[in-house]
Amino acid sequence: MDNLNINFINDDEHPIPSQDLLLKCLQLVADKHHISHAEVNLNIVSNDEIQQINKQFRNKDKPTNIISFEFEKPQGLPDDIANDFLGDIVIAPAVLENEAKEQNKEINDHWQHIFIHGLLHLLGYDHQDDQEAEVMENLEIQLLAQLGIANPYIEQENQNGR
């Protein structure tokens, strides 16, 4: 795990899961994608701040649980430096806590799910259409199972009639 790093930036001073817990998620995603070196910035922000970011970058004027920004290498930056950095993940812990309560999920399980979701976005996965969503969700389910976490979409699938 020495070659995997999460830079924690906690602007919200909100309690977050242990760094080891989230590093385990990064390790799983990295192993699955044969990545031996990776670095991610994890920004912990308030609901107000994530709402501003959501409005600015996604044109949605509401708080969200996570936003990921895949790293785009600037011209001239050496590959050996650029290849390790995956991007930035912004999480609003208060949104995660509310979702976990509403969905009757353990908070640390939900954190791990959402963090893995964000990491997959940094690797190019998306859910703009049903086919992309199915691929991404299936991978999330598989990775979470390795952590002993149940399928987070079961309740949602029952509600959506999937």
From Swiss-Prot:
Presence of keyword Metal-binding: yes
Cofactors named for this entry: Zn(2+)
Family of the protein in this entry: Belongs to the endoribonuclease YbeY family.
Cofactor binding note from Swiss-Prot or TrEMBL: Binds 1 zinc ion.
Entry EC number(s): 3.1.-.-
Function: Single strand-specific metallo-endoribonuclease involved in late-stage 70S ribosome quality control and in maturation of the 3' terminus of the 16S rRNA.
Species whose genome carries this gene: Francisella tularensis subsp. holarctica (strain FTNF002-00 / FTA)
Compartmental location: Cytoplasm
Protein name listed in UniProt: Endoribonuclease YbeY
Transmembrane parts of this sequence: none
Any single Gene Ontology cellular-component annotation: cytoplasm
